[in-house]
């Protein structure tokens, strides 16, 4: 799922094709074989008082009408990709979109997933409460028709009651534990959330580190640190590693509106295998394989990856890695040369 902020040219002027950068993301998805769920981000204001965007934000900015046009054009772009591609929508946050537009998001975009930042930082909670007389989760629950289409990103500043009520809507909590730790945003209440049948997904919001195993490890360790417990997310029949991996797979499938997460007829063949010949996994079986990968290994143990049956990683190396890395280095050199 690509939470896509950047839409316009420097200075905030739209490209001739308003969905030009969505087109670039589609091209990248095609080259890498990723099963793309594109989430164009609607970002209009710099705060709840509807102040203007800063110079660093104007390439994100769209009125609601222009955003609808962008979304429509981006949808056309995706028709050229494989059929496991889909599109949703992402009103950035309660601070960045007009209050009347927020209330209508579910009806204005009647299909596809909806992702939005919610209750990420203390400052956000206080700003929303000052302007709208309610905490972010309180306001969203009362005004936005939360249901299983929604994925709320971070959710690190929720009260116990908010955690329970939001979990019971069927919405997914989209967690980015490395970023939330790096920025000091707070700790998601994963124990209370899962006790109330809440679904969660894992994302890599970080520009510091991108690693699935490390995101899962950080999620679990954060629960232990907050509550002073061990194996806080394990269940009697599933180890910690299996519990959080399967939870992330199930919630991620829901958040991306993708028929995946099971090796069954009718589901996309999204699969990965781990290198069990590695010393990190040697001799491990069953749940111990996942536990060792998440808590003692890293993503170098990922050996093979299939996306909707497309075999994109073989023996730990992406099939197009050579040309992608070479192009990336050339682009970095060009950018540095232009500074």
Label each residue range with its predicted role:
Residues 15-18, 51-55, 129-131, 188-192, ...:
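Short low-complexity, flexible loop/linker segments enriched in glycine and/or proline
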Residues 30, 110, 167, 194-195:
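Anion (oxyanion) recognition and catalysis
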Residues 102, 122-136, 162-167, 184-193, ...:
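Histidine/acidic-residue-rich catalytic or RNA/ligand-binding cores of hydrolases
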Residues 142-149, 191-280:
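His/Asp/Glu-enriched, well-ordered alpha-helical/loop segment
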Residues 149-159, 175-181, 203:
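Catalytic beta/alpha-barrel core
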Residues 221, 243-339:
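Active-site microenvironment of metallo-dependent hydrolases
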């Amino acid at each position: 799922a690509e939470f896509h902020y950047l839409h316009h040219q420097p200075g905030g002027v739209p490209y001739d094709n308003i969905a030009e950068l969505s087109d670039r993301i589609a091209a990248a998805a095609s080259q890498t074989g990723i099963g793309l769920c594109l989430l164009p981000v609607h970002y209009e204001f710099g705060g709840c008082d509807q102040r203007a965007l800063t110079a660093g934000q104007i390439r994100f900015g769209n009125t609601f009408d222009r955003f609808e046009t962008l979304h429509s054009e981006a949808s056309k772009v995706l028709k050229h990709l494989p059929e496991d591609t889909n599109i949703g929508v992402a009103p950035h946050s309660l601070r960045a979109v007009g209050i009347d537009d927020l209330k209508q998001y579910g009806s204005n975009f009647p299909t596809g997933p909806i992702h939005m930042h919610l209750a990420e930082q203390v400052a956000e909670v206080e700003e929303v409460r000052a302007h709208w007389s309610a905490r972010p989760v309180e306001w969203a629950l009362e005004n936005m028709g939360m249901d299983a289409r929604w994925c709320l990103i971070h959710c690190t500043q929720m009260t116990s009651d908010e955690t329970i009520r939001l979990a019971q809507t069927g919405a997914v909590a989209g967690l980015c534990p490395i970023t939330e730790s790096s920025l000091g945003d707070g700790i998601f209440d994963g124990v209370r959330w899962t006790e109330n049948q809440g679904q969660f997904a894992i994302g890599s919001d970080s520009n510091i580190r991108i690693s699935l195993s490390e995101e899962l490890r950080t999620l679990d360790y954060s629960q232990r640190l907050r509550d002073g417990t061990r194996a806080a997310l394990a269940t009697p029949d599933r180890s910690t590693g299996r519990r959080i991996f399967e939870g992330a797979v199930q919630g991620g499938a829901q958040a991306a509106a993708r028929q995946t997460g099971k090796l069954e007829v009718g589901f996309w063949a999204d699969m990965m295998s781990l290198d069990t010949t590695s010393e990190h996994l040697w001799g491990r079986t069953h749940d111990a394989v996942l536990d060792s990968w998440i808590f003692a290994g890293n993503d170098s143990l990922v050996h093979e990856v299939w996306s909707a049956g497309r075999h994109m990683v073989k023996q730990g190396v992406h099939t197009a890695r050579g040309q992608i890395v070479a192009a990336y280095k050339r682009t970095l050199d060009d950018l540095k040369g232009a500074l």
